[in-house]
Amino acid sequence: MVYFKKIAAVGKYHDDQAIPDVIAYITRKDKTPSRIILGYHVDMLDIANCMIEVSKHFGKYSRIRLHHFILTFRPVDASLIPLIAHEICAYIGRTYQVVAAQHEDTPNPHLHIVFNAVSYVNGYRYRGGKEDYYELIDRMNSIIYAHGLHPLIPVKYRANINNPHE
């Protein structure tokens, strides 16, 4: 069982510090002791600036700067996280710069995935509407299912928010 949560709030991720702050958070050493961090179409030593440069190149360094979601796994499924992260990032990375980091600072390991709101391919913004959302969920479900796990459960459907695996 894998739980999905999109991090979104009114006004969140709109300011100039959004990309550097989120990248710094998801790649923190205390959160990622195994250092399972991967990225597509970014310099792993300068992730935030790579994303900012693409947005500025296309004249779109305004409004929402990035998209961020979390996949939470059962501890027994932790060994699958790097494989799943790679496949999800390969899918998103066809069009957007993307970074994933496995956090191990809670009983249930979880994967943070962050991608630039502006495409490095054509400069278009990720719209993030219902159609985009469900297309992404469907692709992630097919990846997760291929690894023998049950499809994603969006966080709003969780019975117990404090322990998603009850």
Q: Where in this protein do the model-derived segments appear?
A:
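N-terminal nicking endonuclease/strand-transfer module with a His-rich metal-binding environment
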Residues: M1-E166
